[in-house]
Regions:
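Short conserved micro-motifs at the rims of enzyme active sites and ligand-binding pockets
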Residues: 181-183, 219-224, 274-275
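An acidic, glycine-/histidine-flanked metal-binding catalytic module
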Residues: 203, 207-256, 268
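Accessory alpha/beta interaction modules
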Residues: 1-206
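Short hinge/gating elements
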Residues: 57-65, 155, 216-220, 244-248, ...
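Selected N-terminal structured segments and early membrane-anchoring regions
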Residues: 158, 214-215, 262, 267
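Short, solvent-exposed polar/charged micro-motifs at secondary-structure junctions
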Residues: 97-104, 219-221, 257-258
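Short, charged alpha-helical interaction segments and adjacent helix-coil junctions
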Residues: 2-51, 120-125, 235-337
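Non-catalytic, well-ordered alpha-helical scaffold segments
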Residues: 58, 72-75, 134, 164-167, ...
Length: 337
């Protein structure tokens, strides 16, 4: 008999229990009936273990992986990604200069300072941006400049450029752009600047792009390695299929505690419904923003095409005018003969 999440987590309630509580509580029922049928089903699936929650979505991430409350968990993720032990000194205010079009695609965006004073920005994109390199470079430069201003203000006359530390931009992508799919077996791409001579100059900015959809495709083929900490975390962050959740807690038992916390939260229907509602509001607004951005991109592309066609027509008209002038000149010459 196939095991379910309820077999591992006895605190998971049945669908009937959750629905009964909702219909017996006026405030809960009011919120519940404000959702679409699809959203109601998703909420019940979360509460009853039929589907795992999306850990990387902002509200759920804060529930389980908040760097303020559980710094050791995000430290473990960053250590696995950066291939070195890290400690989080503090969570920095995210004074992001992102334009609204960029924010519409983000479901998580946090900035932390590590023990060596380097900065790590962790973001999750629902859909991979166009021009990911250019966008990430601009945001990384913004973080670097903010660090420079903060350190210079703090150190004053004792400031040295050696006080400026690395800025890591770590991007998780749920649905990768087509360029990433040219590498179907590679889901982590690391980038940093270097000279063409081998001269070692630390230019401070490093980028790591992690394609979660490509990771899951590879996971289907090779399974979860017992000895790979990074793969274990990526599985936890990306999968919502109970089958893979069960495989994860079998190969890496430490994740059972995290899932237990999730299902303990699910038992408080009022609190979990509040988290779910906030996430729906953010996703709905982000979807609207994204659709507007897409429409604007389409309009801009059409305008470019129309301008190009108008230019071609003008050039063709000019050529016709020149031909007409030439014909008129030849006709005049023939008439004079």
């Amino acid at each position: 008999m196939t095991k379910t999440l309820k077999d591992h987590f006895s605190i998971i309630r049945s669908r009937e229990e959750v629905i009964t509580e909702i219909y017996n509580t006026a405030d809960l029922l009011y919120v519940y009936e404000g959702w679409t049928e699809e959203q109601q089903t998703l909420f019940l699936d979360y509460c009853t273990g039929m589907r795992g929650i999306k850990i990387l979505y902002d509200q759920f991430f804060k529930l389980i992986l908040s760097p303020e409350q559980y710094p050791e968990r995000l430290e473990s993720i960053l250590s696995a990604i950066l291939n070195e032990p890290v400690k989080i000194l503090q969570v920095l205010p995210n004074e992001s200069t992102r334009i609204a079009a960029e924010k519409s695609l983000l479901v998580l965006d946090i900035v932390v300072e590590l023990n060596d004073r380097s900065i790590a920005n962790v973001e999750v994109q629902r859909i991979g941006y166009a021009f990911p390199g250019q966008r990430s470079a601009c945001y990384s430069a913004d973080l670097l400049m903010r660090q420079y201003k903060r350190v210079k203000k703090s150190k004053r006359k004792n400031f040295r450029y050696s006080d400026i530390k690395k800025v890591y931009t770590i991007v998780f992508i749920e649905k990768s752009a087509s360029d990433f799919h040219k590498f179907p077996h590679t889901y982590i791409h690391r980038s940093k600047q270097q000279t063409d001579t081998g001269l070692q100059i630390d230019l401070l900015q490093e980028y790591i792009f992690i394609s979660l959809d490509i990771f899951k495709n590879n996971l289907q083929n090779k399974g979860i390695s017992k000895d790979n900490e990074l793969e274990a975390w990526l599985t936890f962050l990306s999968v919502d299929d109970p089958k893979w959740i069960l495989k994860l807690i079998e190969t890496h038992p430490k994740f059972k505690k995290l899932y237990l916390e999730i299902y303990e939260a699910c038992r408080n229907t009022e609190v979990f419904m509040g988290l779910f509602s906030k996430e729906l509001l953010e996703l709905d607004q982000n979807t609207v923003d994204f659709m507007i951005d897409e429409m604007q991109d389409t309009i801009d592309a059409q305008k470019v095409e129309i301008d190009s066609q108008a230019k071609q027509i003008a050039e063709q008209q000019l050529q016709l005018n020149e031909k007409d002038a030439l014909i008129a000149q030849l006709q005049k010459q023939l008439a004079e003969k």
